[in-house]
Design a protein with these regions (language model features):
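Outer-membrane beta-barrel pore domains and translocons
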Residues: 41, 140, 158, 171-177, ...
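N-terminal periplasmic "start-of-domain" segments of outer-membrane beta-barrel proteins
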Residues: 33-63, 92, 135
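Transmembrane beta-barrel wall of Gram-negative outer-membrane proteins
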Residues: 176-205, 210-233
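Outer-membrane beta-barrel architecture
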Residues: 70, 94, 136, 156, ...
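Short acidic/polar hinge/loop motifs at secondary-structure boundaries
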Residues: 111-139, 158
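Hydrophobic, lipid-facing positions within transmembrane beta-strands of outer-membrane proteins
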Residues: 34, 91, 151-153, 166-168, ...
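Extracytoplasmic beta-strand/coil segments of soluble accessory domains associated
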Residues: 69, 73-111, 133
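Transmembrane beta-strand segments of Gram-negative outer membrane beta-barrel proteins
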Residues: 132-134, 153, 159-174, 197-199
Length: 233
């Protein structure tokens, strides 16, 4: 009986020692890395490409609610075509003589080219330039990975991001041939829960230079962002 009792004491002692050994803290430290955002559709100063960057200040200076091709018409090797003669409605562009079917266009990294014709119909994106932070135009074969539309040139569009403080703004433009544009924009700024909401409403009207060139466009742009200590969504 004493031998059995002694064996039980030994087993309990071994089990207690094993639990204590498992409870010891791990000496290896765990490091949580912050989120890294990689943008691979734009060229840098060391990239062997011919490109032009247009910042937000220059976009605001040249913007009068016209479509992107007309806003960029002063760039080298770029020709803008506008059917109505006012810069709104049906517009297109050529870069180094290449038509729209070989010019790849991305918005925040997402391709805008039509999957069938490979063109971008700017008439469906009225007053987009008012919501952009920057544009990069790459002449010739560029950094895009979105298929055959990048053979002639590439255009990378980036929309405005959230601001720290709330804001509100309004603008109105009047031009020839009954052209009128008005837009209202507002943003909440960074809220306590990390959310930020930005929205813009635009209205573009024009009689056009030619017959049947009338334009009546409405555009609504909205962006919802969430910022945390380690991540941006």
């Amino acid at each position: 009986m004493k031998k059995v009792f002694l064996a039980l004491i030994v087993l309990v002692s071994l089990h207690t020692t094993q639990i204590r050994a498992q409870a010891e803290p791990d000496s290896l430290s765990t490091i949580q890395l912050e989120e890294v955002v990689v943008s691979a559709t734009r060229a840098g100063k060391d990239t062997p490409l011919t490109y032009t960057n247009i910042g937000e200040a220059e976009l605001k200076k040249n913007n009068s609610a016209q479509n992107i091709p007309v806003v960029l018409q002063t760039l080298p090797s770029l020709v803008a075509i506008t059917e109505g003669g006012t810069g709104v409605g049906n517009t297109s562009l050529r870069i180094r003589g290449t038509d729209a079917t070989r010019i790849n266009v991305t918005l925040n990294g997402m391709p805008l080219n039509n999957p069938e014709s490979q063109e971008v119909y700017w008439v469906n994106l009225p007053d987009l330039s008012s919501s952009l932070q920057s544009i990069q135009v790459q002449r010739g074969v560029g950094t895009s990975t979105n298929g055959s539309a990048a053979f002639g040139a590439s255009m990378s569009l980036k929309t405005v991001g959230a601001t720290s403080n709330p804001y509100g703004e309004a603008s109105t433009s009047v031009g020839s041939y009954g052209t009128f544009s008005s837009s209202v924009a507002a943003g909440t700024g960074m809220l306590k829960n990390g959310l930020a909401l930005d929205a813009r409403y635009s209205k573009v009207l024009s009689d056009g230079y030619i017959r049947n060139g009338k334009v009546d466009h409405t555009n609504l742009f909205a962006s919802l962002s969430h910022y945390s200590a380690k991540q941006i969504v």
